[in-house]
Amino acid sequence: NLGKGESVMFKILNKKVLHENILQFTLEAPLIARKAEPGQFVVLRVNEYGERVPLTIADFDREKGTIDIIFMVIGASTTVLASLNAGDSILDLVGPLGKKTDIRPDMGTVVCIGGGIGVAPIYPIARKMKQVGNHVITIMGAKNKDILILKDEMEKISDEVIVTKCERKAPKFIYGDISSLKNNDSISLFFIVLYF
């Protein structure tokens, strides 16, 4: 319990550069980690002058009390966020917010599709789908192999991983992969998150 005038800062425990403009932070946030579910997000503010930035919870560890966020540096707020390092703190972190993804053990074969930074939101969904006993096929893509994020992590939690290269607009990169799967009667659900 905090007294009047006291505040909590959220410490960055780890900073990982996934690509020159894509970063992953592990944040100390035990209350959020305890309640987080796949599909939810947080809103953060780096400092008192910063704007509020919504980011998907890309991973969480209830025992360690941590959450991971993955973001692309594309504007002033994410540039300031990217300038922080392990040991630094974020002023405000609110969450988990949003409706959790409906995940049940009776869903059968589930296809999780992520493009670009959109791989981050599907990771906790695919992991939980697998943990409860579903068959998980992951299709992931990026403009080139250097910016393909979380490939090793997705391979550990998926029954099958299909990696594609996206040279054109987002729908084109997955069209061939989905069309080969769409007539498969054993597939019961598709999750698609694309950010390029």
Predicted regions and their residues:
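FNR/FR-type flavoprotein reductase catalytic core
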Residues: 76-196
